[in-house]
C-alpha cells in the first residue's frame, strides 16, 4: 500500500492528511472496479467486525455489512436495544471487552466524544459510522462521486455548495473535507445555522495550506453561482424533537433545492447530491405528515430535482459501500 494506515482509527477527517484521504478514495475506486470486474480479492478473511448502532440506519449498516462480506469478514450487529452500552456498561469498558473479541469496530451514535473514547480504549481500529458532529465515511463517498461526475476535474478544481443546516454533521464534515482537499465550498444557510466558529477557524487554517476556498453566506444566488455540485441534507437531524420542525421549516424554506436554485448556478451540467434519506415527496409516513402540516410535498429538495438528470444521489449512496470497504481494507486488511 502507498500509505500505512493499518491499525488506524477512522473517527474524523481532521485526523488525516490530504494524501491519506485521497489514497482512501483512490482505493475505493479500485475496489469498485474490482467488484464490477469480478476480480476482487479478499483482504479481510478471518476478521470479525462489530457494528454498534445506537441510531438506526439503512445505508451505513448495509454498506458495512456488504463491504465486510465481500472482503471475507464476519460481522455482529449490535442495535439500539441490543447491548448494555451506556445503560449497564460504560463505553470505556465496552471498548476493552469488544477489543478482545473483534478485529475492528464500527460505531454510529451520538456525541463524537463517545466514538473517540471507543477508539482510545478498544485496541483495534474503530470507524465512525456517524456522530452528531461528524460523518466521515459519507464524505469519502461524496468526494468519490464528485470525481466520477466531475468531468475529469481533480477535487481541488471542484466548486460545490451545501444548502440548509450547515451546523450539522454533514455541514461540518463537508467543510473539513473540502478544506483538506483544497476545494471551493460554499455553505449557504441562515447565519444561526453556520458551523461552530472554532471549527470554521480550524478549517480556514487548513485552507491556507491547501488552497481551499471556504465561503459562508446567507445569499443563495451568490452561494450557488458557478457550482459544479449542489448538496443538501434534511433540515431536522436524527434525534431532534419534532417540535423543532415549525421554526426550522420557516427558516430553511428559502434554502430548498428546487429548479430555480439549479438554474441559478448558471451551470447546465450541475449535479445534485444528498446523503439520504430525503424528504422530496409525500410517499413516506413522515413525508405525508410534512405535506399535511406545511402544504409542501418536498422539504430540502423538490421532487423534480430529486428525480431529474441532475440528481446523482443513488450513485452517491452506492459509493458508501465502496468507500467504507476502502477504509476497512486500509486499516485492517492484509
Swiss-Prot record:
Reply yes or no: does the keyword Cytoplasm apply.
yes
Residues annotated for L-ornithine binding in this entry = 169, 233, 237-238
A GO molecular function held by the record: amino acid binding
Q: What is its EC number?
A: 2.1.3.3
The entry's carbamoyl phosphate-binding residues are 57-60, 84, 108, 135-138, 275-276, 320
Entry's Gene Ontology BP terms: arginine biosynthetic process via ornithine; citrulline biosynthetic process; L-arginine biosynthetic process
Question: Sorted alphabetically, which keywords does the UniProt record give?
Answer: Amino-acid biosynthesis, Arginine biosynthesis, Cytoplasm, Transferase
Q: Which Gene3D superfamilies match?
A: Aspartate/ornithine carbamoyltransferase
Q: In which pathway does it act?
A: Amino-acid biosynthesis; L-arginine biosynthesis; L-arginine from L-ornithine and carbamoyl phosphate: step 1/3
A GO cellular component annotation in the UniProt record: cytoplasm
* Disulfide partners: none
Write down the superkingdom of origin.
Bacteria
Q: Where in the cell is it found?
A: Cytoplasm
Task: From the UniProt record, list the reaction(s) this protein catalyses.
Answer: carbamoyl phosphate + L-ornithine = L-citrulline + phosphate + H(+)
Whether RNA-binding counts among this entry's keywords is: no
According to its UniProt record, this protein's enzyme class is transferase
Query: PROSITE patterns from the entry?
Result: CARBAMOYLTRANSFERASE
Described function: Reversibly catalyzes the transfer of the carbamoyl group from carbamoyl phosphate (CP) to the N(epsilon) atom of ornithine (ORN) to produce L-citrulline.
Family named by the database record? Belongs to the aspartate/ornithine carbamoyltransferase superfamily. OTCase family.
Identify this protein by name.
Answer: Ornithine carbamoyltransferase
Q: Show the taxonomic lineage.
A: Bacteria, Pseudomonadati, Pseudomonadota, Gammaproteobacteria, Aeromonadales
Its gene?
A: argF
